[in-house]
Amino acid sequence: MKTKAAVRNMRLEDIDHVYEIEASSFTSPWTKDSFYHELLENPYAHYLVIEKDGHLAGYCGIWIVMDDAQITNIAIKPEYRGQSLGETLFRSAVELCKEKDARRLSLEVRVSNHPAQGLYKKFGMQPGGIRKNYYTDNGEDALIMWVTINE
């Protein structure tokens, strides 16, 4: 039986699980303290999580400043990848940005991360530039992608 995934706002009690996903997804993961800071002290930060079968399967962070939104991080737990959960989560993030009256949405993605770029292109995101040597673990460039979401 296929169960539906549910997206909700991230809570403090989710941080341990979110950190596990972060650490398994990125070579230079954010710290747990960074997530606490985001939820408790950053007025621009909005975090969503996606659950499947009662388990936290992924998360997405967004900063919304005036009419500009930026995805700070998005990740799906390795064992849940390939189930369209990233697409569901990203769609929810875009909807949140629209609700908050953001006009533009941007993000950075590794130039080598073609699967993620493909997902973002499904939502109309287009390449907008390169940040040279953006990633500190290996000096890889970041591709800046953006889309207008509210006109």
UniProtKB/Swiss-Prot annotation:
Primary enzyme class: transferase
**Compartments in which it is found:** Cytoplasm
| Residues annotated to bind acetyl-CoA | 74-76, 113
- Disulfide bond sites: none
Q: Which GO terms describe its molecular function?
A: protein-N-terminal-alanine acetyltransferase activity
According to the entry, every stretch annotated as the N-acetyltransferase domain falls at 5-150
Q: What is this enzyme's EC?
A: 2.3.1.266
Give the active-site positions: 108 (proton acceptor), 120 (proton donor)
Does the entry feature the keyword ATP-binding, yes or no? Answer: no
Q: Which InterPro entries match?
A: AcTrfase_RimI/Ard1, Acyl_CoA_acyltransferase, GNAT_dom, YpeA/RimI_acetyltransf
Q: Which UniProt keywords are given for this protein, alphabetically ordered?
A: Acyltransferase, Cytoplasm, Transferase
What CDD domains does the record point to?
NAT_SF
By its UniProt entry, which Pfam families does this protein fall under?
Answer: Acetyltransf_1 (PF00583)
Q: Catalytic activity, per the record? A: N-terminal L-alanyl-[ribosomal protein bS18] + acetyl-CoA = N-terminal N(alpha)-acetyl-L-alanyl-[ribosomal protein bS18] + CoA + H(+)
- Spell out the GO cellular component terms annotated for this protein, sorted alphabetically and separated by semicolons: cytoplasm
The free-text function statement in the UniProt record for this protein reads: Acetylates the N-terminal alanine of ribosomal protein bS18.
Q: Which NCBIfam families match?
A: rimI
- Indicate the family of this protein: Belongs to the acetyltransferase family. RimI subfamily.
According to UniProt, the name of this protein is Putative [ribosomal protein bS18]-alanine N-acetyltransferase
To which species is this protein native? Answer: Bacillus subtilis (strain 168)
